[in-house]
Amino acid sequence: TNFGGVFRKANPMAAGQIAFSDYRQYVPSYDAPASFIGSPIYDDDQKIGVLIFQMPLDRITEVMAVRDGLGESGESYLVGMDHLMRSDAFLDENHSVVNSFRNPEKGELHNPAIDEALIGNSGIMTTSDYRQVSVLSAYMPVNISEGVVWGMEAKIDVEEAFASID
């Protein structure tokens, strides 16, 4: 499991180092996506254990769900290297974290902005989103841990972004 993987990574680490396991379905949580962070605990030079905690998926989604300045059609979200959601999309329930892991065929998110973010690029572009709607997109990589990058995208429909103000 990803819990066990974090333990195996964290157990041999020096004090102050952190192990991370990206989101995957986790059987003890009824196959809900789960991610873990772990670190060895030392008393002076003696390792006394490994502390592991589950990343709060709802808190990540709560932060990403802030819609200030995004108008009616805007949204922002995080996507993992597997193209599955790491926060819920606002406009389509298929693109929630839980649904994207349970049904990857419908929940995977592929678009040029996310592809660019996942290879380490930041920028702004006009592209089509998962609804096949033309959007103005700002994107960037989020370096979560060594070897783990999530793509972040904030977007709004081009029609709304360039609409005249009445």
Where are the language model's segments positioned?
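Solvent-exposed loop/turn segments at secondary-structure junctions
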Residues: 26-28, 57-59, 160
